A protein has these predicted regions:
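Intrinsically disordered, low-complexity repeat segments enriched in small/polar residues
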Residues: 5-6, 14-15, 324
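Bacterial N-terminal signal peptides
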Residues: 11-26
């Protein structure tokens, strides 16, 4: 073998080794690489509402962790097949922690989680877990009960209005807690419900609000994602109670308060665990005590004695002395659902499929 051919073979061997080395580096994740995080939302972020509150959580983790993380968020993703495609795309593109912030993302996320065992998934408002998928929720019903005290105290017609998205337990328990809070101070109060079968549809939310006002409701609240209910009530000169965010900029005169959601600390905790490699799938359900649910400032029209009742109920809730579904709880037909001296269990809450007394109409099945 000539010196030339030997040198050529050596050069070829070194080139191959360098190429292989570069491929290994390119295909691995350095400890210095940022943790890629994805958020999937069912509605636009906007400046108030369900998705807006979750986006405050995104901003909180970006401020907290800086260049240790890289975040991508996708808005207005329909529940179902499209959600599965979006979640799968996020996982395929290297996002190692993915949050899905709508109930209807649950089954699509389960499918994707099984296909990406090395990725962490978190689903909001659902009930399923996997080896690499947890779920998280807030005890919205606690805030509903407190806001019901306000509504029951302020109504003149004794008819409250409620614009609701879908007849799932999360929404139903909110309606029931709201009227129980109202009746704790005003036994004559009743609530009428209009279902719009959408999380975010400002047009239908507005139409439902007007319909409820036409039926005699003088205070309107909602379990939907936009500000349309508060805005429509303001235009009609009727009181409202916002949901998700403080919506007083859309109801400066007539919003009495709002049930507010606070996700920031939850997202910070999950990201920290992912960075520390201590993340585990859990089912988290925080409420007023944990700071995940609150009320915005009360309208100046709310008397001090009403504000005091709300504050006392909140303090009792935090102390474990007050549960919105402490027995006896009777459904519309008079059937006892929770016995006197007992509190409803989380399991029964999570499958609530009945209206309590004080709710007008029949629950869609």
């Amino acid at each position: 073998m000539t010196k030339y051919s030997l040198a050529l073979r050596f050069k070829t061997l070194m080139s191959s080794l360098l190429l292989a080395s570069s491929m290994v580096v390119a295909g691995s994740v350095s400890a210095d690489d940022p943790l890629k995080i994805g958020f999937v939302h069912v509605s636009p972020i906007g400046d108030a509402g369900w998705t807006y509150q979750h986006d405050l959580g995104r901003k909180a983790i970006e401020e907290k962790f800086g260049d240790k993380i890289q975040v991508k968020y996708i808005e207005s993703v329909p529940e179902g097949a499209e959600a599965e495609r979006v979640i799968r795309d996020l996982a395929s593109s290297g996002n190692k922690l993915i949050f899905g912030t709508s109930f209807g993302f649950m089954n699509p996320m389960v499918k994707v989680a099984k296909a990406f065992p090395d990725t962490y998934f978190e689903h909001a408002t659902g009930y399923k877990t996997e080896a690499n998928m947890g779920n998280y929720n807030a005890r919205f019903y606690e805030g509903r009960y407190l806001s019901g005290i306000v509504a029951g105290s302020m109504t003149k017609s004794n008819t409250l209005g409620y614009v609701a998205a879908f007849p799932i337990p999360e929404v139903v328990m909110g309606i029931n807690a709201y009227i129980r809070g109202a009746q704790s101070v005003n036994p004559k109060a009743e609530v009428k419900v209009v279902w719009i079968n959408a999380w975010f549809d400002p047009g239908r939310e507005r139409e439902a609000t007007v319909a409820l006002i036409d039926q005699g409701a003088d205070i309107i609240t909602h379990h939907t994602d936009s500000t349309a209910v508060v805005s429509a009530a303001e235009e009609k000169g009727k009181y409202s109670i916002g949901y998700n965010s403080d919506m007083s900029k859309y109801g400066p005169k007539y919003q009495l308060t709002a049930v507010t959601h606070h996700w920031e600390q939850f997202y910070i905790d999950q990201v920290q665990q992912a960075l520390d490699k201590t993340w585990k799938p859990t089912a988290i359900w925080g409420g007023v005590k944990e700071g995940m649910i609150g009320l915005s400032a009360l309208n100046a029209a709310v008397p001090k004695e009403v504000a005091d009742k709300v504050e006392q109920a909140k303090a009792d809730m935090i102390a474990g002395k007050l549960h919105p579904f402490a027995g006896p709880v009777l459904d519309q037909d008079g059937k006892e659902r929770v016995a006197a001296g007992s509190n409803i269990t989380d399991e029964d809450l999570s499958k609530m499929d009945y209206y309590v007394q004080g709710v007008q109409g029949k629950l869609p099945k």
